[in-house]
């Protein structure tokens, strides 16, 4: 069960709320890796609910760099609704092949009229805010290994909350270049730090772009990671 659907269960939506929510969700769409769901400067007219694959929000700098400001995993929604009708100050791009649905602005407004569904969007927004605060602390206060360890823990915790982990393994498709855009390090520094973490026996790479965490406590300690700070559902 993906995170947004996990939240639906957690907030005790009635059958009518669930029916209304599903009725206002658009058809499933699929796009290739690198495709844009939205671009900086565009007016936000719909919300994107990620079904399969990963996407990211990023900023385009004048020097051509594209620092990633947040990750969108299956079950995540691109905005809690507060950004509707405003110009985006970021872009959204698929970093793997992506499957998603949309909720247009008119449908979103109708959904917000239902108190429990409004709470659902607010809860999703609270999680996004908590993750963003964790990223700020990660970049400003941790060393290279700590930043990467924290990111690995965060993605595992978010995947676990969405029911997408198995025996310590989870899908982690980020390239070293993309990791560098998340944690603010060079690709070379990322490579060295990842190798150090692997040599410590904390993680190992698996097939199909998966990672296995062999020592959760050790990895969490290295990254000073605390899952409760992300406000994820139990």
Predicted regions and their residues:
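Cyclic nucleotide-binding regulatory module and flanking cytosolic helices
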Residues: 1-33, 76-78, 82-85
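Short loop/turn microsegments at loop-to-beta-strand junctions
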Residues: 26, 44-45, 170
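Conserved catalytic Walker-motif region of ABC-type ATPase nucleotide-binding domains
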Residues: 31, 50, 213
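Cyclic nucleotide-binding regulatory domains
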Residues: 35-97
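A residue-level structural signature of the nucleotidyltransferase/glycosyltransferase Rossmann-like core
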Residues: 47, 69, 100-101, 171, ...
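Cyclic-nucleotide recognition modules
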Residues: 70-134
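Polybasic "coupling" helices that flank or enter modular domains
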Residues: 119-184
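Phosphate-/nucleic-acid-contacting segments
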Residues: 158-234
């Amino acid at each position: 069960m993906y995170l947004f659907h996990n939240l639906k269960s957690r907030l005790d939506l009635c059958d009518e709320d669930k029916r209304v929510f599903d009725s206002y969700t658009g058809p499933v769409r699929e796009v290739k890796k690198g495709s844009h769901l939205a671009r900086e400067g565009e007016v936000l007219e719909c919300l994107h609910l990620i079904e399969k694959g990963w996407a990211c929000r990023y900023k385009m700098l004048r020097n051509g760099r594209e620092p990633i400001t947040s990750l969108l995993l299956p079950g995540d929604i691109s905005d809690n609704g507060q950004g509707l009708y405003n110009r985006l100050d970021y872009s959204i791009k698929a970093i793997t092949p992506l499957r998603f649905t949309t909720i247009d602005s008119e449908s979103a407004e109708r959904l917000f009229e239902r108190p429990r569904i409004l709470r659902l969007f607010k809860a999703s927004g609270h999680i996004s805010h908590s993750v963003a605060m964790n990223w700020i602390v990660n970049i400003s206060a941790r060393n290279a290994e700590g930043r990467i360890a924290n990111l690995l823990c965060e993605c595992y915790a978010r995947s676990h909350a969405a029911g997408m982990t198995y025996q310590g393994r989870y899908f982690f498709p980020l390239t070293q270049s993309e990791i560098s855009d998340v944690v603010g390090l060079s690709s070379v520094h990322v490579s060295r730090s990842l190798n150090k973490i692997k040599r410590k026996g904390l993680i190992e790479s698996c097939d199909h772009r998966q990672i296995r965490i062999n020592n959760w406590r050790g990895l969490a300690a290295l990254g000073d990671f605390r899952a409760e700070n992300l406000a994820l559902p139990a």
